[in-house]
A protein has these predicted regions:
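A charged, solvent-exposed segment within the mature domains of Sec-exported extracytoplasmic proteins
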Residues: 1-13
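Short, surface-exposed, charged/polar-biased interaction segments
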Residues: 18, 33, 48, 57, ...
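Amphipathic alpha-helical scaffolding segments comprising HEAT/armadillo-like alpha-solenoid repeats
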Residues: 22-40, 62-74, 96-108, 131-146, ...
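Structural detector for internal amphipathic alpha-helices that build alpha-solenoid repeat scaffolds
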Residues: 10-26, 41, 48-62, 82-96, ...
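Solenoid-like repeat scaffolds
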Residues: 2-5, 38-45, 71-80, 105-114, ...
């Protein structure tokens, strides 16, 4: 990564970029936090590398680096946006309480740009992959519930809950279907995928029956996408 040869440095970065999150977590423990911060602050470093460097800081950083990450998250320029995902996950790893509080704050604030909200969703997905403590899982569900209440993010939150097979918000999800802010086709399909995947109970069965009556074609298409029925030739 530090090679004076642009080609060698680029190849090294690509190897990092292709690595799994779990591999990066282990490697991050061997990194030098001061070096990572210098790279993040170096205007000559390409923007596409900043998120990775910030992510790695989460494995080797110290208490003094928490304030650095918090400051990075407050910035709104393009380089800060490129750093955001990695910095958020790094903060959650270094100080879960401050990290989740910061993420929830971004999701709740009315003036948070959409791009930042989407970064928060991506950070939640990564945190779910690399953090296994029950307390972290509880924070993940809490953050997704916040996103669920925001129409522009609800389909993403519902899809993550479905993939995680977490059904604790089923009643809330069914109740908001078709209400203001939750009527776009992509949104309706997210609700339907969730209902088709969730354990069947009377409220789910009723919801699916109503959708079958209102839009049988959509139900069929979503079932096909989930492999629940064979695709038509």
């Amino acid at each position: 990564l530090q090679s004076p040869s642009r080609e060698i440095a680029s190849d090294a970065f690509l190897e990092f970029a292709k690595a799994s999150d779990s591999t990066l977590v282990e490697f991050s423990k061997k990194m030098n936090p001061a070096l990572l911060k210098s790279w993040i602050l170096d205007p000559k470093v390409p923007e596409e590398r900043l998120g990775l460097y910030a992510f790695l800081l989460g494995g080797c950083g110290r208490d003094a680096d928490i304030s650095f990450l918090l400051e990075m998250l407050k910035l709104q320029d393009s380089r800060a946006q490129a750093t955001f995902d990695g910095a958020m996950v790094a903060l959650i790893r270094l100080h879960p309480d401050k990290g989740w509080k910061a993420l929830d704050g971004f999701l709740k604030a009315d003036d948070t740009p959409l791009q930042t909200r989407l970064s928060c969703i991506r950070s939640i997905k990564v945190a779910n992959e690399i953090m296994q403590d029950k307390s972290d899982k509880a924070e993940i569900f809490k953050a997704l519930n916040i996103a669920l209440k925001q129409g522009e993010l609800a389909d993403l939150a519902i899809e993550e809950l479905r993939k995680m097979k977490y059904w604790g918000f089923t009643q809330e999800i069914l109740n908001i279907y078709g209400t203001k802010g939750y009527t776009a086709p992509v949104m309706k399909r997210a609700f339907l995928r969730y209902a088709l995947t969730a354990p069947k109970d009377p409220q789910i069965e009723k919801f699916l029956a109503q959708l079958e009556t209102k839009d049988s074609q959509m139900v069929l298409e979503v079932k096909e996408s989930l492999g629940l029925v064979p695709l038509k030739p």
